[in-house]
Structure formats: structure tokens, C-alpha cells
Amino acid sequence: MLAKILLLLLLCGSGSIVVYAREFNINCNSNLVMYWGQNSRGVTNPGENQLPLDEYCDKESGDVLVLSFLSEFNADGLHPPGLNLANACVTTFTNTTLLHCPNIGKAITHCQKQGKVVLLSMGGAAGAYGFADDTQAER
């Protein structure tokens, strides 16, 4: 086994090994989907917070990133949507509870330029959301 590894390194040459970022391929059945936004990194690495979204696009092998979560929407038709992205948004728009997340838009654009698909997950484990019927959901 060691001989095969050494042969591979010899054939590749030192310094010529390149790691390529993955891109979403709709015809592939091995795309990797990752959730981002609920500080799951802090769960697996206590004391550490999630990295900014664009850093995951630069470093990780994921093809699709799902932003988690749009936790409140259409609850009563009177309130703006509620977004929960853990530590990614720390301010709100003036006189509202609507989060202001200017870096998220830039990060999404950055990720898309790298061939990543970025989606927004509606719902989550808890929250106020739902639709009365299919017609309301389609609007």
C-alpha cells in the first residue's frame, strides 16, 4: 500500500497536486448538501462560532448550501418574515425586528460565482410559519 502511495506522489510530482472546489452538477448523484446558519460548528467544536458563509464556499467540499432558517413567515400576514442565521446577523433595520444582514447577500453572490447553489430553508424546528392553503403558498 505504501508503495502505491509513493508511486502516486512520484507520478504527480511535488507541488503539482491541486485541490479543486466542487461545483453543483445537476446530473450527478453525489452532490453534497450542507446546512449553514444555526452555528452547528459550535455544537461540534464548543467555544467556536460558525464561519462566515463565503468561507465555507472557499474551504468546504459542499455543492449546495442551505441557509437555515426563515423561521417566521405568513404567521398572521401582519408581520415581516423572521430570519434566524445564528451569529451572522447582529443588527435590525430601524424600528423593526427584521434582521439586517448585509454580508449575507455578498456571500451568496460569492458562493454562486464558485458554482455553489444557495437555498433558503423555510421553517426549522420551531417558529411561526405556514400557509392556509396551496393558493396562498403559491402567491
Regions found by a protein language model. Give the residues of each.
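Chitinase-like catalytic core of GlcNAc-active glycosidases
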Residues: 20-139
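Terminal targeting and flexible regions in eukaryotic proteins, enriched
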Residues: 2-12, 35, 66
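N-terminal signal peptide
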Residues: 2, 10-27
